[in-house]
Amino acid sequence: MQIFVKTLTGKTITLEVEPSDTIENVKAKIQDKEGIPPDQQRLIFAGKQLEDGRTLSDYNIQKESTLHLVLRLRGG
């Protein structure tokens, strides 16, 4: 299924995923497309931050859902 990931810059990334994919998997796919290390990615859906060990179906994320990607920058 396809889902969309919207970044803070307003860019939308399209990903091909399965409902059984973990959030960790999704972050890896984002890394493949965008080169952003998973440890800097925070994914938000329906106002909730998604945890790495959970699956898309755990959060009831279905086809054509839009997740929001927030970058956690190190340091500071």
UniProtKB/Swiss-Prot annotation:
Start and end residues of each Ubiquitin-like domain: 1-76
GO CC annotation, single: cytoplasm
Record bears the keyword Zinc-finger: no
Major location (coarse): cytoplasm
CDD domains hit by this protein: Ubl_ubiquitin (cd01803)
Record's keyword annotation contains Ubl conjugation: yes
InterPro entries found in the cross-reference section: Ubiquitin-like_dom, Ubiquitin-like_domsf, Ubiquitin_CS, Ubiquitin_dom, Ubiquitin_ubiquitin-like
Site, as annotated: Interacts with activating enzyme: R54, R72
Keywords: Cytoplasm, Isopeptide bond, Nucleus, Ubl conjugation
Subcellular location: Cytoplasm; Nucleus
Site (Essential for function): H68
Cross-link (Glycyl lysine isopeptide (Gly-Lys) (interchain with K-? in acceptor proteins)): G76
Glycyl lysine isopeptide (Lys-Gly) (interchain with G-Cter in ubiquitin) cross-link, renumbered residues: K6, K11, K27, K29, K33, K48, K63
Physiological role: Ubiquitin Exists either covalently attached to another protein, or free (unanchored). When covalently bound, it is conjugated to target proteins via an isopeptide bond either as a monomer (monoubiquitin), a polymer linked via different Lys residues of the ubiquitin (polyubiquitin chains) or a linear polymer linked via the initiator Met of the ubiquitin (linear polyubiquitin chains).
Annotated family: Belongs to the ubiquitin family.
Miscellaneous information on this protein: Ubiquitin is synthesized as a polyubiquitin precursor with exact head to tail repeats, the number of repeats differ between species. In some species there is a final amino-acid after the last repeat. Some ubiquitin genes contain a single copy of ubiquitin fused to a ribosomal protein (either eL40 or eS31).
Protein name in the entry: Ubiquitin
